[in-house]
């Protein structure tokens, strides 16, 4: 049976409705276009994100269920609290965004390198526009973990994370959830559920509910200073 898939017009930033995404493969909505900052921003504002492998065209997705965190109710595991009390990790925001993006792509096994140089350059461009942000974890002035994503009002769209030392990415998420919540953040989008996200407390929303929440959250703003370059206070767990 033939499958109809929209090819994006290079001269237009319009996307088909996210509800038109295929059931198999789950969430595939369109192909083509480019990774300009304008198109990426338009995509995320409609609950759509790019993901494609080597040799494939740019593919755009909006899966039927969305993995998310509620930063206001995020609870770290007791073992993570215990680890944090002993670890000499420091956490920052927007101190090394290009480096975080590159490490998210370069520290993955070869078969998982969807975050290619083209994608990395696209998100670095968004960082220069103040749309893409990073959370960094440091040990003895060495960058050992973190993640990056896009801010859309009271929603943060997490893209990718990396960890070079034990629990580094978990510490990054924990600290960011508290910081984001304190500045009025309401939801963190993780796109597709996996065992690691589930173990950290992520849950899923049906696409329709996620899009409804996105519509409301993108019209709001977190409080001033949320994404200013800064060091986050150490938690007294």
Swiss-Prot record:
Keywords: Acyltransferase, Cytoplasm, Transferase. Its EC number is 2.3.2.6. It is found in: Cytoplasm. GO terms for biological process: protein catabolic process. GO terms for cellular component: cytoplasm. Its main location: cytoplasm. It catalyses: N-terminal L-lysyl-[protein] + L-leucyl-tRNA(Leu) = N-terminal L-leucyl-L-lysyl-[protein] + tRNA(Leu) + H(+); N-terminal L-arginyl-[protein] + L-leucyl-tRNA(Leu) = N-terminal L-leucyl-L-arginyl-[protein] + tRNA(Leu) + H(+); L-phenylalanyl-tRNA(Phe) + an N-terminal L-alpha-aminoacyl-[protein] = an N-terminal L-phenylalanyl-L-alpha-aminoacyl-[protein] + tRNA(Phe). It comes from the Bacteria. GO terms for molecular function: leucyl-tRNA--protein transferase activity. InterPro entries: Acyl_CoA_acyltransferase (IPR016181), Leu/Phe-tRNA_Trfase (IPR004616), Leu/Phe-tRNA_Trfase_C (IPR042203), Leu/Phe-tRNA_Trfase_N (IPR042221). Belongs to the L/F-transferase family. Functions in the N-end rule pathway of protein degradation where it conjugates Leu, Phe and, less efficiently, Met from aminoacyl-tRNAs to the N-termini of proteins containing an N-terminal arginine or lysine. This is Leucyl/phenylalanyl-tRNA--protein transferase.
């Amino acid at each position: 049976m033939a499958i109809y898939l929209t090819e994006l017009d290079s001269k237009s930033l319009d996307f088909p409705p996210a509800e038109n995404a295929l059931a198999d493969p789950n969430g595939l909505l369109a192909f083509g276009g480019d990774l300009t900052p304008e198109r990426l921003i338009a995509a995320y504002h409609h609950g759509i994100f790019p993901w494609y492998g080597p040799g494939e065209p740019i593919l755009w997705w909006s899966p039927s269920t969305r993995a998310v965190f509620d930063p206001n109710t995020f609870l770290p595991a007791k073992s993570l609290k215990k680890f944090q009390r002993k670890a000499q990790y420091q956490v920052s925001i927007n101190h090394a965004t290009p480096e975080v993006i590159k490490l998210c792509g370069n520290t993955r096994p070869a078969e998982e390198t969807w975050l290619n140089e083209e994608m990395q350059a696209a998100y670095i461009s968004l960082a220069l526009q103040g749309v893409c942000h990073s959370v960094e974890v440091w040990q003895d002035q060495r960058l050992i973990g973190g993640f990056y994503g896009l801010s859309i009002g009271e929603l943060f769209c997490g893209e990718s994370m990396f960890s070079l030392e034990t629990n580094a990415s978990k510490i990054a998420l924990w600290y960011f959830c508290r910081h984001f919540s304190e500045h009025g953040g309401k939801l963190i989008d993780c796109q597709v559920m996996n065992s690691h996200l589930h173990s950290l407390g992520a849950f899923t929303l049906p696409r329709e509910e996620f899009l409804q929440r996105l519509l409301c959250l993108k019209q709001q703003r977190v409080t001033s200073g949320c994404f200013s370059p800064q060091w986050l206070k150490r938690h007294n767990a």
